């Protein structure tokens, strides 16, 4: 039987958080992520992982306090469910999701929701996996979809109106980010250095409160890219991927 661990204020310092294990360049990001989790545990934030060395975990909390531009009540929101490498194909993802569903029912929640996309994108869940458990698309912004599993007739969560704009006034390349992911800190640092070295303007907007997260002008889990006022992607960038993205944009 698989053994799992839920992170707490008592064990978080000695436990890994699955991503960026042993990768030195991301250790500052791991520290930032752990601090973020510590501050969210009081909100009922759950980080449950396999008791093993690997990327195998699920992370969720109440939609009311989740750092996403989604309005709703009495639902749990899944930030991330990830099973990677040799742990795939062993039913672990099923066990993690079933834990979320059962935990939500025990808390008398009205359902569970999560962000996916019509076509697979980095750092988002797989739509077909959630469909297998009865999740249905309840709201859409472009390629991005909000899926929900309903337990009763309570009002379903929706994207906030601000998120539907997918536009900003700023024309320079702009990144919205939060430390919900341990890969973010290094991306911000490397992009910032790249911009300085190449005399480029890249704006960084830190999302560090619930209010800011609920009012971002796009879909958002931990990173969003804008250029010439338009939303481009939710992909976390480094210098190399930024260059590749800008080349692609200029060729279009």
Give the positions of each predicted feature.
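Conserved beta-strand in the GNAT
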Residues: 49, 53-65, 77, 82
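Conserved acetyl-CoA-binding loop-helix of GNAT-fold acetyltransferases
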Residues: 83, 89-104
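Non-catalytic, surface beta->alpha helical segment in thiol-disulfide oxidoreductase systems
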Residues: 228-252
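Conserved catalytic-core motifs of GNAT/GCN5-like acyltransferases
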Residues: 115, 131-148, 232
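Conserved GNAT acetyl-CoA-binding A-motif
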Residues: 104-121
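C-terminal "cap" of GNAT-fold acetyltransferases
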Residues: 142-165
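Short amphipathic alpha-helix that is part of the acyltransferase structural core
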Residues: 1-51, 161-162, 171, 181-183, ...
